[in-house]
Amino acid sequence: MDYEAIIGLEVHVQLKTQTKLFCGCAVEYGATPNSRVCPVCLGLPGALPSPNKEAIILTIQTGLMLGSEIARRGKFDRKNYFYPDMPKNYQISQYDQPLCKGGSVQLYPLAFPKDAQKDPQAQERKKIRIVRVHLEEDVGKSFHFDENSGIDFNRAGTPLMEIVSEADIRSPEEAFAYLSALRQILRYGNVSDCDMEKGQLRCDVNVSVKPAGEKKWGTKCEIKNLNSISAVRKALKYEIQRQIHVLSTGSKISQETLRWDDLRGQTVPMRTKEYAHDYRYFPDPDLLTVVTEGELVAEAKKRIPELPEQKKQRLCEVYRLNEYQSSVLASDPQLADYFEKAASTASNKVAVANFLINDYLAVASDLETAVPIPAEYFSELSNLVEQGKLHMKQAKEIVKVMVAEKKSPAAIVQEQGIGQITSVEVLQGLCREAIEANPKSVSDYRSGKLAALNALKGYVMKKTKGQANPQIVHDLLEKTLKETG
């Protein structure tokens, strides 16, 4: 029997604010444990929360970027549960009046994992609908040692935005693409750095399976706190197969909360799945209703940048790039800006794009440390090729040196003496030498075997250590053979 997976994601995004959601404590990753805390984020009696305006604006901005409906009013609620890293024994969140409802994320071809990528030219693009976007506070972080445990409350109270998708996702690969596309939008809007290693983007997955074609959905399980996009894909692959195996043997799926054990490569039960009523939500009496219309929405609208899909379209139209080139360059706003700066003074814009995509990204493993190379270097390199002073193979080698040594193409050419030989006089002599040294190739060429010309070209290229202009050599050989034939 064939089965179908039904998947929905809850993505928690740490907002890019200077201070916490309800107090003035600094948000600082890696600070000394419990050094960024106060009575408010420690939940001490009598300490009253005060909402962070910037966090509210960033949440509204996200909703606008996703095409959500912005609520005229939003409120904060207490989500009650006990956990050691929750100092108040409740979390301030939003229940029935979130700041944003609806919206969608479009899956673009290059967002899929490399071993499952779609055709960049494909016209059909699936959209994953958004249920809601709401604001809540983060909890502290537990640390477990050999004989005891500790809690760092520096993270408690950090602004978190939760983005809940509809259960529109049908495979681990679509989940991967959704997270990649969503992260791209958030980075473009400068809402969050989305650094998963620092816990700035975490994901909970709801997944169930059902016989293909059946309308009724199966019993869902939730996999908590997945901290990488690849982990989401791996966890879903395993859990889908586990549920299919359970159903195939005639057993039933238990609704439960799971965690992903990366070392064992399997999901592990944590507890039975909670329902909304288990949390006893009620409005937070210490916080007023948030009125979004007017100033807050106006400020959020000002911050909306050119979004990824818009940038891809513009790169295609302005620079005559194809879908693949524009998608790669637009995958990161920093890379796209870098390309545009490089292309501004290049005679061949497409060549600059190809150098960045095919050569630069292959050797620059860390974009943030690689980008300080002046963008003008790629314009200069492209122009040297256009002017016939370098051929493509030399240019590709120069990119490696540029990244490693932070030197300009002109400086590298001068230091290594690798400029292209374009002198007709010099190359004419070498072509005559090639003809004299390779009588069989000459005979083959004159008898109609045109490919024999490559042997003569190879002779000249070897003599010049690859520095001869291949097109000039080709033309001179044809001309000389014709004149001496």
UniProtKB/Swiss-Prot annotation:
The keyword Ligase applies. InterPro entries: Asn/Gln-tRNA_amidoTrfase_suB/E, Asn/Gln-tRNA_Trfase_suB/E_cat, Asn/Gln_amidotransferase, Asn/Gln_tRNA_amidoTrase-B-like, GatB, GatB_C_1, GatB_Yqey_C_2, Gln-tRNA_amidoTrfase_suB_CS. GO terms for molecular function: asparaginyl-tRNA synthase (glutamine-hydrolyzing) activity; ATP binding; glutaminyl-tRNA synthase (glutamine-hydrolyzing) activity. Keywords: ATP-binding, Ligase, Nucleotide-binding, Protein biosynthesis. It catalyses: L-glutamyl-tRNA(Gln) + L-glutamine + ATP + H2O = L-glutaminyl-tRNA(Gln) + L-glutamate + ADP + phosphate + H(+); L-aspartyl-tRNA(Asn) + L-glutamine + ATP + H2O = L-asparaginyl-tRNA(Asn) + L-glutamate + ADP + phosphate + 2 H(+). The keyword Nucleotide-binding applies. Its EC number is 6.3.5.-. It comes from the Bacteria. One of its GO terms (biological process) is translation. Transmembrane segments: none annotated. Belongs to the GatB/GatE family. GatB subfamily. PANTHER family: GLUTAMYL-TRNA GLN AMIDOTRANSFERASE SUBUNIT B MITOCHONDRIAL AND PROKARYOTIC PET112-RELATED, GLUTAMYL-TRNA(GLN) AMIDOTRANSFERASE SUBUNIT B, MITOCHONDRIAL. Allows the formation of correctly charged Asn-tRNA(Asn) or Gln-tRNA(Gln) through the transamidation of misacylated Asp-tRNA(Asn) or Glu-tRNA(Gln) in organisms which lack either or both of asparaginyl-tRNA or glutaminyl-tRNA synthetases. The reaction takes place in the presence of glutamine and ATP through an activated phospho-Asp-tRNA(Asn) or phospho-Glu-tRNA(Gln). Heterotrimer of A, B and C subunits. This is Aspartyl/glutamyl-tRNA(Asn/Gln) amidotransferase subunit B. It comes from Methylacidiphilum infernorum (isolate V4).
